[in-house]
A protein has these predicted regions:
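Residues at alpha-helix caps and immediate loop-helix transition turns in enzyme cores, especially N-
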Residues: 35-36, 66, 245-246
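Short acidic-hydrophobic surface loop/beta-edge motif
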Residues: 16, 156-163
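Conserved beta-strand hairpin/beta-sheet module of binuclear metal-dependent hydrolase folds
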Residues: 1-44, 180-197
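Residue-level marker for buried hydrophobic side chains located in beta-strands
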Residues: 23-25, 55, 80, 188-190, ...
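Metallo-beta-lactamase
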Residues: 28-31, 139-144, 160-249
Length: 255
C-alpha cells in the first residue's frame, strides 16, 4: 500500500508498505524525514527497522535532502537506491543536466506546492542537487557510499529490486536519471516528476519542466503503451486515480 506523507514540503514523499518491509520514496527535506518516521512508527504502527529501501526518483534538491537524516534512523541493512547516472554526479564526472522552462514549468509547480510547506524544516535543504550553472556540479551525500545501490545501465528499462512485485522503471526526460516505481499487481505507479498531479481535471499531466522534451515525450508514449496504472502518485500534486488505467487520461506534451 502506498501512503503519501502529509505536508512534507515542496515535493511529495511516499511510504510503501508491504508485508515484508517498507520502501520510502523521495524524502526531500529534513522535515520530510521527521514526518516519514512519524508516519511509519505512529501512523502505521511499524518499526524503522522494517525500512528496507530509501529511494530518490531523481537527484534534485527537493527529492534528496532528507535522505541522510532518514537513513540515520534506519538499520544498517537499509539501502539507498539511485539511478546509475548519480554515480557519475557523485564522482564529479558529470554535472546535473540543465533544465528548461523555469518560468512556465517550474515556477507554477513551486507556487502550488507552497501549501504543503508547514515549517522551516520542510524547506531545510543543503546545496546538493541544484540544477543551476555553478551549482549543478555540487553533488554530495551525507552518508557512506556503501549504503547505495545504483540501478540501470545494462540496457533494460524495468528492474526488480527485491521488494515484492515492485519494479523500478527508467522514465528519463524530466532528468536523465529519472526513475519511477511500479507494481503491476496493484496498479500503483510512483512517478516522481515525470507526471504531475496539478491538472484541474484531476487526470494529471506530463511535466513541463524538463531536461529533454523529446526524451520525455518518448518516455510517456512507452509507459502509456506498455503498463497500466490505476493509481499514479506524482512528485508534486495530488494522486491520480482511474479504474483500470489512469495513464490514457494524463495530459501529454505536444509538439
Amino acid at each position: 500500500m502506498v501512503h503519501r506523507v502529509a505536508d512534507c514540503g515542496f515535493a511529495n514523499a511516499y511510504v510503501v508498505e508491504e508485508r515484508h518491509g517498507i520502501l520510502v520514496i523521495d524524502p526531500g527535506s529534513r522535515g520530510a524525514a521527521d514526518k516519514i518516521e512519524s508516519l511509519v512508527t505512529d501512523g502505521l504502527g511499524k518499526s524503522m527497522e522494517e525500512v528496507m529501501f530509501i529511494a530518490a526518483t531523481h537527484f534534485h534538491i527537493d527529492h534528496i535532502n532528507g535522505l541522510g537524516r532518514l537513513l540515520s534512523r534506519c538499520p544498517p541493512a537499509t539501502k539507498v537506491i539511485f539511478h546509475h547516472r548519480v554515480r557519475d554526479y557523485l564522482d564529479g564526472k558529470r554535472k546535473l543536466t540543465p533544465m528548461r522552462n523555469w518560468l512556465s514549468g517550474c515556477l507554477p509547480v513551486a507556487i502550488a506546492s507552497l501549501k504543503y510547506v508547514q515549517g522551516i524544516r520542510d524547506i531545510s535543504f543543503g546545496i546538493s542537487g541544484i540544477p543551476l550553472p555553478l551549482l549543478n556540479g555540487l553533488c554530495r551525500i551525507g552518508f557512506s557510499r556503501q549504503r547505495v545501490t545504483f540501478i540501470g545501465g545494462d540496457g533494460r528499462w524495468r528492474y526488480g529490486f527485491g521488494f515484492g512485485d515492485w519494479e523500478i522503471i527508467e522514465t528519463p526526460g524530466h532528468t536523465e536519471d529519472s526513475i519511477s516505481f511500479y507494481n503491476s499487481g496493484s496498479g500503483d505507479l510512483v512517478s516522481g516528476d515525470f507526471i504531475l498531479g496539478y491538472e484541474s481535471c484531476g487526470k494529471g499531466k506530463v511535466a513541463r519542466f524538463y531536461w529533454d522534451r523529446e526524451v520525455l515525450m518518448r518516455t510517456f508514449v512507452r509507459i502509456r503503451n506498455e503498463i497500466k496504472a490505476a493509481n499514479i502518485y506524482p512528485g508534486h500534486g495530488d494522486a491520480i486515480h482511474s479504474p483500470g488505467n489512469a495513464l490514457p487520461g494524463v495530459q501529454p506534451l505536444t509538439l
